[in-house]
Amino acid sequence: MDVTLAAGSVWTDPACPVARTVDLIGDRWSLMIIRDAMDGATSFTEFHQRLGIARNILTDRLRKLVEHGILDKSAATDGRRHTYRLTEAGQDLFTAVVALRQWGERHAFAPDEPHSILVDDQGRELPELHPLGQDGTPLSAEASHVRKTA
């Protein structure tokens, strides 16, 4: 499923993938909901308890993430509540969330300040993400550029 902008909304910069992504998921609460969905949260109550977000804001962000194709909403087994799960598009955000986390670990904490650590199923810390060129060499912003398409 492709992600879409809500009806009546306009892209900030229609030709830019970064701008479109920010239009879809760039606010603080949406990213935290996506992060917590990746960490196993599936219900309104779980998101609310983990985030401490106002209920009306949580309702709005969950609705938008479902509309945008990031989360799937389905009836819970009790039939009264709903569960939220990442769609394929939502799961594809994992690398972006890891990159944001790793940037935060490097730049948003003092050297000895404690913080959570993302680990794999064996308890090992994830390696640093680095974009690689076609030949396997590391890339930097200086070694790449945006090519505009018609």
What are the residue ranges of the model-derived segments?
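C-terminal regulatory/oligomerization modules of transcriptional regulators
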Residues: 1, 98, 102-150
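N-terminal intrinsically disordered/low-complexity leader segments
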Residues: 1-13
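N-terminal helix-turn-helix DNA-binding core of bacterial DNA-binding proteins
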Residues: 14-54
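Alpha-helical linker/hinge and terminal dimerization helices associated
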Residues: 21, 31, 68, 97-107
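Basic, amphipathic "hinge/linker" alpha-helix immediately C-terminal to the N-terminal HTH DNA-binding motif
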Residues: 26, 77-97
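Canonical helix-turn-helix DNA-binding module
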Residues: 44, 48-75, 80
